[in-house]
Amino acid sequence: MDPQDEQLAYAYILGKDGGTPLIYSDDLPDSEDKDNGRWGNVWNSSTMKNMLSFHNAMQGKSMTMISSDQCTLLFKRGKEGVVGINKCGETRGVTVDTYQHEFNWHVQYKDVLSSATETVSSRYHTFNLPPRSARMFKL
């Protein structure tokens, strides 16, 4: 699997509700490792730590699917978190009716992966998802 696709999969697994995800880590000797250490200590990478932090913060929060198509997936966790995944090669915008899907207004949602922020301030808010990336916003 492409490493970027793997990161998008981790964002989905650690962003959604339910369960206790298991993170695969591989410490094979160099002679046996066909992935050049890709999974060695993955649980200890800053990206994985941030995804796990999001997962733990959203524990017990409901999950509501907001939008999905061939490229993007957007869901929220209570009013405290939003996960957006874009698997295509260009930026995609997902516009949300914040009356239909409740969000906290006028406070920053901060992405744990990139430090990008989103502030909902009107009925229709567009989450712009960069190409081949995930966003895990939390209050």
What annotation goes with each model-predicted range?
Residues 1-139:
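Carbohydrate-interacting/catalytic domains
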